Design a protein with these regions (language model features):
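A structured phosphate/pyrophosphate-recognition subdomain
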Residues: 2-15, 33-40, 113-169
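Hydrophobic/aromatic residues located in beta-strands of well-ordered beta-sheets
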Residues: 47-49, 103, 149
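Active-site cofactor/cluster-binding pocket
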Residues: 62-118
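Divalent metal-coordination and catalytic microenvironments
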Residues: 24, 34, 58, 80, ...
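Short, glycine- and charge-enriched coil/turn segments that flank and shape catalytic ligand pockets
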Residues: 42-46, 72-75, 99-102, 138-143
């Protein structure tokens, strides 16, 4: 799988990271996984995660306390939408998508409307975290990134029991 995300990050100075309304484990795992990964590999990129408030049971994820819950007037070079099948799922944070200079959506839902400038939709993936993992340079996946990605995997696979679980998962 080509690393479209990495190519879109070239020359970018700011990234808004969005997920869906009522964030679950895959949404939080993918958004915070990407946030922490960017901090590892691209320390010069200013990244922020924007999501509705999430359950405290996910507070163990690094970056959970840094999630922004209200929109502001910032404009970003790139908006990365994760686990969101259409713009409506971005809720009140769709303003970042609309104002961004470029956009990409990574998702695993077959119903994805491919609304971003670039879209990587892998319908047979177990989770968006699995899709995201395929886009990342393993050398920059530390424990915090891995914990985020694992959270998404176990959430969307029912701890590897659901039929969406595969050998690749």
């Amino acid at each position: 799988m080509s690393r479209i995300l990495e190519s879109m990050l070239d020359g970018v100075k700011s990234v808004a990271i969005l997920g869906h309304i009522r964030p679950d484990g895959d949404c939080l795992g993918s958004t915070l996984g990407l946030y922490n990964y960017l901090g590892n590999k691209y320390p010069g990129i200013h990244a922020r995660v924007y999501l509705e408030e999430a359950a405290e049971k996910f507070a163990y994820l690094k970056g959970f306390d840094e999630i922004r819950h209200e929109p502001d007037d910032r404009v970003y070079d790139l908006c990365v939408c994760l686990d969101s099948g259409d713009m409506g799922r971005l809720g009140k944070f769709s303003c970042y998508f609309e104002r961004a200079r470029d956009s990409i959506c990574l998702d695993h839902h077959v119903t994805n409307t491919r609304y971003a400038s670039a879209n990587l939709v892998v319908a047979d993936a177990s989770s968006t975290c699995e899709v995201l993992y395929g886009q990342l340079d393993e050398a920059y996946i530390d424990r915090t990134v891995a914990e985020c990605l694992y959270t998404g995997l176990i959430h969307d696979t029912g701890v590897f029991k659901y039929s969406c679980t595969s050998a690749k998962t």
